[in-house]
């Protein structure tokens, strides 16, 4: 009685402001968080407001592909 696909998947969240700002200048790094999401409840891209240690503020972290 195995189900086809897992409901919970592991996703990587990346800071959107670090990605935008690192094009112009040398960046110290890009903030990334690893979390899980329920595929049935949130089928589209995941976005959370998390703390970015490189920007020193809370920014929107968006889901990226592995």
Swiss-Prot record:
One GO CC annotation: ribosome
Main subcellular location of this protein, as a coarse class: plastid
Keyword tags: Chloroplast, Plastid, Ribonucleoprotein, Ribosomal protein
Gene3D superfamilies xrefs: Ribosomal protein L33
Compartment list: Plastid, Chloroplast
GO biological process: translation
Pfam families: Ribosomal_L33 (PF00471)
InterPro entries xref list: Ribosomal_bL33, Ribosomal_bL33_CS, Ribosomal_bL33_sf, Ribosomal_zn-bd
One annotated GO molecular function: structural constituent of ribosome
SUPFAM superfamilies: Zn-binding ribosomal proteins (SSF57829)
Stated family: Belongs to the bacterial ribosomal protein bL33 family.
HAMAP family cross-referenced by the UniProt entry: Ribosomal_bL33
Annotated protein name in UniProt: Large ribosomal subunit protein bL33c
């Amino acid at each position: 009685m195995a189900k086809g696909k897992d409901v919970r998947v592991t996703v990587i969240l990346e800071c959107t402001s670090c990605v935008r700002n690192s094009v112009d200048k040398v960046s110290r790094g890009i903030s990334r968080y690893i979390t899980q999401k329920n595929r049935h409840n949130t089928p589209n891209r995941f976005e959370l407001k998390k703390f970015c240690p490189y920007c020193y503020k809370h920014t929107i972290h968006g889901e990226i592909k592995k």
